[in-house]
Amino acid sequence: MDIRYSCNQKDFKRYTTEEMRDEMLITGLYKADEMVAVYSHVDRMVTLGCMPVHEEVSIDKGIDVWANFGTHYFLERREIGIFNIGDGAGTVTADGKEYHLNYKDCLYLTKGNQKVTFKSDDPEHPAKFYMVSAPAHCSYENKLITIEQAAKRPLGSVETCNKRTINQFIHPSVLKTCQLSMGMTALEPGSNWNTMPSHTHERRMEIYTYFELPEGQVVFHMCGEPTQTRHIVMHNEDAVISPSWSIHSGVGTSNYTFIWAMGGENMEFD
């Protein structure tokens, strides 16, 4: 498991491009039959990627759960949101119950699920499971939310190059969680700016992952304090960590889709 420590805004001003990318950028999440995990000390969030091809992959494969979390199993004191962004469908099994995820479907697993595994329906077209996990203090209910069931909020306009639809999956309007919130924002063709106006939220960090970005295209992800902005060039299926003091916005050379994940104190937000 890759460990990322939190940085502060005063030090961040002096970072080189390489230091900034090492601190915030997450790449290479999808390796065949492996579980890739990045632990951030910003709100203790864990970002994971899994592309099962020929095997059924356990959530703790390659992870020393006791050494990293001080628990006996991954979700003993954690909750997790799972999206399928792969070419094919896949199945998540949690304590013996199977959940089938098509493209862009989401699964919320609450604290206390002991055995969690991932598999693809077709090895020629594997699922890609993108996940974010946050600490949890109590248990709610596991829930599968399809893309059709997500709460939808159209925003922006063609004139401002940010016409988009926010799909709220793991959100107070859809289900209860301890602190995790996740959703998916899809930009329409001809639009390339997301999250405008850019902003910060003092009580929540945020993680973005960009996908549906055509080959050869990139996203310039904006970060830093509002008066000291920087950018990180990102490619398809990269993810990026945003501390609470950092803006998080981006512009692409094409339209794209991104998944946002937040953890923190408050749950009420637009």
Model-derived regions, located:
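Short, glycine-/Ser/Thr-/acidic-enriched flexible segments
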Residues: P52-V53, G88, E215, P226, ...
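Acidic/His-leaning functional-site neighborhoods
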Residues: Y39, D43, K176-I247, V251-N255
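A short glycine-rich, His/Asp/Glu-containing loop-to-beta-strand
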Residues: G28-N68, K163-E206
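A short beta-strand-loop-beta hairpin characteristic of the jelly-roll/cupin
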Residues: F74-N102, F211-N236
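Acidic, low-complexity central loop/insert segments
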Residues: G86, G90-P126, V132-P135
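Conserved metal-binding segment of the jelly-roll/cupin
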Residues: L101-D121, V233-S254, I259-G263
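N-terminal non-catalytic cap/leader segment that marks the start of a structured domain
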Residues: D2-I85, A89
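Double-stranded beta-helix
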Residues: P123-R164, G224, I259-D270
